[in-house]
Amino acid sequence: MIPRIIAIVLILAGLLSQSAIALDSKKIYQLNEERVFQIRVLNRETGKKSSIGSGFIVGDGRQIATNFHVIGQIILEPELFYLSYLRKDGREGELKLLALDVARDLALLGSEELLGTAAEMSELPPRGSPIYAMGNPLDLGLSIAVGTNGGILNQTDDSRILFSGSLNPGMSGGPTFNERGEVIGINVATARNSISFIVPSRFLRDLVTLSTTTSLNSKEDLRAEVTRQVLAYETSYIGQLVERQWPSLTLRKLNLPGIISPTVRCWDNSAKLATTALYKRYQIRCSNKNHIYLDSDNRFVGRLIYEYYWLESDELNAIQFHNLYEDLNKDQIESKLGRDTVSNFNCETWFVEVSSQEMKSNLCRREYVEYEGMSDVLFTAALTGHSNQGFFITVILTAVDFESTLPLIEKFLESIQWNP
């Protein structure tokens, strides 16, 4: 009887211990309200805010973590803007940029004064577990949002975890806590389609370590570091694509590369034609969502898009079909970037045999003015020699090292199979 009583007591003690560890949102807020700040980008001339976000104490107590996109304006114009924090009690101070992880949208800032003690960091809790995000939504003061760990965000790498709650603008860069009040990630509220996600804290730990060896003292240092990181990430990503085994999909008489990566989704994009149309057109569009914030002008880069078009007609004569085919095969990268941001496209054209069929290929590149070595690439290849059927492929990559894209384009062509 006594052993049974002891066992019951031990079980109850364990349950009470777990209950005591788990905190509610009110307690988590109270424990961390002095650790979470508003991060501001201020104009040096006017002293007024240009953009705001959130940040929190990490490392030795003189460092603040936030999102890269929160402070992105200083990348292009550090002479015009500077960084500042604002505490809940109204105290403020200037900050210096220490280190960046552009691909994961992280930035580490430094203060000359001791700001406080950092909260403990921990790994992500199991999927479905409650998590709590703190930040300064819409410049309305410090707030906390309750959600759950929704797992890895589809079409991204493992650096983006879905947050089921709502993160309003201004909460980006704030901490995400588990039920024990430990930091398990950083809020990101910029995702399109109103999706919020968090970046796991392990990437922040790496950034704190990196800050001891990084120097970002000039405008040139900033640009060079951003360029290096983006190109390194994209080159690795493209290399992984090339090494993968690609499944195929079928479009009329062709077998084509299908979903070449877990980061990619493919959709039917065929235009709805009138019943009186004299031709048929089929289109498949595949793209990734693994995008990277670059700066306040260029916004998001790292896009991969590939599209397939098939055109056929039994009604048009050869000349009519050729004119229609040419009109449709005029793809370009959708962009509002001006010449002060990117150069004009420089293109080369050649003919290549693909699966016993001749195709006319165009390879175009344009350079980023502010980021040396960074390019957008546009590749097209169109089937030739047929009077009533046509096919063309378009591949678009943004903010990449040009040479790294060539093996990928070559693999696309090698993977096309003609089925007469």
Segments from the language model and where they lie:
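Short, well-structured beta-strand
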Residues: 228, 347-420
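N-terminal targeting sequences that direct proteins away from the cytosol to non-cytosolic compartments
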Residues: 215-286, 397-420
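Secretory pathway targeting signatures of secreted, lumenal, and periplasmic proteins
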Residues: 264-324
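Flexible, gly/ser-rich surface segments that form the specificity/activation loops bordering the active-site cleft
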Residues: 23-24, 73-75, 117-160, 168, ...
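A conserved glycine-rich beta-strand in the N-terminal activation segment of trypsin-fold
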Residues: 23-25, 42-61, 93
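C-terminal cap/linker of serine protease catalytic domains
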Residues: 24-29, 95, 183-254
